[in-house]
Regions:
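Hydrophobic beta-strand positions in extracellular immunoglobulin-like domains
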Residues: 412-414
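Extracellular glycan-modifying ectodomains
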Residues: 1-397, 401-409, 418-496
Length: 496
């Protein structure tokens, strides 16, 4: 019995030591993700009593990224996929007919609220107006998640895991169409029948070559008005190593993919004089995998990935060149977070860069103090000292110049740490509760002290009334000054 116990203990010790031993003798597996660094292994945080989460994460990756650990993961996933025909990890879940879906894209089944959708869509239009004021055509495009295009391929388990995802997808698209959103939704060209060629890979998170082509044809129409018609015919086939098996499950897998080289060279020739010029494209992986095709459509475009380590500097440099087009793409699962809290928010790299570029252009506007009959103060009381005391929800309504691109400058001092908001007027108030809406607005600094905001808007806003909320409740504004003016129009006034 003692001998058996010793053998059991020895086997268990070998089982525990094998991953670490293989790591020491063989190093990290080449396929390992989030590999352990020397800095992490020597960090004082490993000895911090209250940092158990850090130690657990390092230990888990130390074992799982070892050759033995990786082999165990591969074997387990290969057994699930190829023998049992079903896998369910933190990142991948099986659908019907061998399809795989990316679980983080389901966002834990959370629902998008109508309020958040409205704010999100309004913010995109506000970005578009800030860009238009400085002569830039800003467009945002959305690449639909695979489960949104192919919900019929989810199967029972994946369908249950999606939770509210499909309903939320339908809801935001319905609201976008009702509000006449400028978003280029690639879902609009992803319609299909059961017998149609696939637009996405069965086991990849991305669209395939046919899906890319449909999306790019849509871009051409949206940005130029030129419609690219005709059947898209394949000219060959290649094998494609798909990302979910290879990168996430760590098992080898390839999927057949149709190629369309003849169609591309005929429809989008390299020497075409119809290429879209002067374009800055900020993108994630969907446009990343479409890079070669996009170069057939755009003339020397400037591509920048969200993952670029110098993204803030690169975005500012790109806008400093005053491109004619700025095209920003996001995959649907990241859309809400990128717009409201990420790169496209007013504190994000793109939103802030647009505000700064707009303010720089507005600095060339000839300003004068706004006429008294062009100003209206609400919940703001002027004191004998000249200061203003703000109550709850103070507002300043500013009548903009009647012609050209209206400019406004607002400066004041305050001791409170509350953001300044500028609400853009809504000309078409269909489905709105008034001339201003939370999303169709700019969020500016909340820093105490002197504030000085410059803004130039498109000629669409000439003669309209801008709403400025200097702070949102209770405080003093000193040295308040409001100036207005105008810059020449770029083009005849268009309808909003």
């Amino acid at each position: 019995m003692k001998l058996a116990n010793l053998a059991t203990i020895g086997a268990f010790a070998v089982f525990l030591a094998a991953p670490v031993g293989s790591l020491v003798t063989m190093g990290l597996d080449p396929a390992a993700e989030r590999a352990i660094t020397l800095t992490e292994l020597t960090s004082a945080k490993l000895l911090t009593p209250n940092d158990e989460k850090y130690r657990n994460d390092v230990a888990r990756r130390l074992v799982s990224n070892s050759p033995v650990g990786m082999d165990a993961i591969r074997a387990k996933n290969a057994l699930d996929v190829k023998v049992f025909g079903f896998v369910n990890t933190s990142q991948v879940i099986s659908g019907a007919d061998g399809w795989l879906f990316y679980k983080p894209g389901f966002q834990n089944g959370a629902c998008m609220s109508e309020h958040d959708i409205g704010v999100m869509l309004g913010h995109v239009e506000a970005l578009r107006m800030i860009a238009k004021g400085i002569g830039i055509d800003f467009r945002m495009s959305v690449s639909p998640d695979k489960e949104v295009v192919y919900p019929e391929k989810l199967g029972p388990a994946a369908a249950a895991a999606t939770g509210c995802k499909i309903l939320s997808s339908r809801l935001w698209r319905r609201i976008a169409k009702t509000s006449k959103s400028s978003i280029i939704d690639h879902f609009d060209v992803m319609g299909h029948d059961v017998t149609d060629d696939l637009l996405y890979f069965r086991t990849d998170t991305h669209w395939n070559e046919l899906g890319k082509l449909k999306a790019v044809r849509q871009l051409v129409f949206e940005l130029t008005g030129r419609k690219v018609d005709g059947p898209i015919l394949a000219s060959g086939q290649v094998m494609h190593a798909t990302d979910m098996p290879n990168r996430l499950l760590r098992i080898d897998h390839e999927e057949a993919e149709e190629t369309y080289d003849d169609y591309v060279s005929r429809t989008f020739p390299d020497d075409s004089n119809q290429k879209i010029a002067d374009t800055f494209i900020l993108h994630d992986s969907f446009y990343g995998v479409s890079y070669d095709l996009l170069k057939h459509v755009f003339l020397n475009p400037l591509f920048l990935s969200y993952g670029n380590e110098n993204i803030e500097l690169e975005v500012r440099n790109a806008l400093a060149k005053s491109p004619k087009h700025v095209l920003v793409n996001t995959v649907e699962r990241n859309m809400l977070s990128k717009i409201l809290h990420g790169e496209m928010s007013w504190t994000g790299v793109l939103g802030k860069a647009f505000l700064d570029a707009n303010a720089k252009t507005a600095g060339g506007c000839k300003m004068s103090d706004a006429a008294k009959d062009g100003l209206k103060f609400e919940n703001l009381s002027k004191q004998p000292s000249g200061d203003f005391t703000a109550g709850v929800d103070p507002q300043i309504l500013v009548r903009l110049a009647e012609h050209g691109r209206p400019c406004v400058r607002i400066s004041f001092e305050t001791a409170v740490r509350q953001n300044t908001y500028v609400y853009l007027p809504i000309k078409d108030q269909v489905n709105q509760n008034g001339p201003y809406f939370e999303g169709f607005s700019l969020m500016l600094t909340d820093a105490p002290g002197a504030r000085d905001f410059w803004l130039v808007l498109p000629e669409d806003f000439a003669g309209m009334t801008l709403r400025v909320d200097p702070i949102y409740s209770t405080g003093t504004l000193s040295h308040l000054r409001i100036q207005t003016g105008a810059l020449p129009s770029f083009s005849p006034v268009s309808n909003m």
